[in-house]
Swiss-Prot record:
Record keywords, A-Z: DNA recombination, DNA-binding, Transcription, Transcription regulation, Translation regulation
Subunit field text: Heterodimer of an alpha and a beta chain.
Organism: Stenotrophomonas maltophilia (strain K279a)
Name of the gene encoding the protein in the UniProt record: ihfA
Gene Ontology BP terms: DNA recombination; positive regulation of metabolic process; regulation of DNA-templated transcription; regulation of translation
NCBIfam families, sorted: himA (TIGR00987), PRK00285.1 (NF001401)
Gene Ontology CC terms: cytosol
Molecular-function GO term, any one: DNA binding
SMART domains assigned: BHL
Job description of the protein: This protein is one of the two subunits of integration host factor, a specific DNA-binding protein that functions in genetic recombination as well as in transcriptional and translational control.
Protein name: Integration host factor subunit alpha
Xref: PROSITE patterns: HISTONE_LIKE (PS00045)
Amino acid sequence: MALTKAEMAEKLFDEVGLNKREAKEFVDAFFDVLREALEQGRQVKLSGFGNFDLRRKNQRPGRNPKTGEEIPISARTVVTFRPGQKLKERVEAYAGSGQ
């Protein structure tokens, strides 16, 4: 099950005490700042969580799965996420607990 922006705003409402409008604006602003930084080619480092980076991928050969025809996959920039050590440890501990 995925965590949505609406659920994040609801958590802020419940746990931090922001009203619902403020919580939604906070979540939207957070993602806007992340998006803007990445659009400017900057790395985003969230201490204790992980890093968002831009990675350049070169053009490469691909294949149309329906026809088998070779087609070029164009060069592009992709966003990658590398989890931080603390996040890895917490996820591994949760996964190991059998939940």
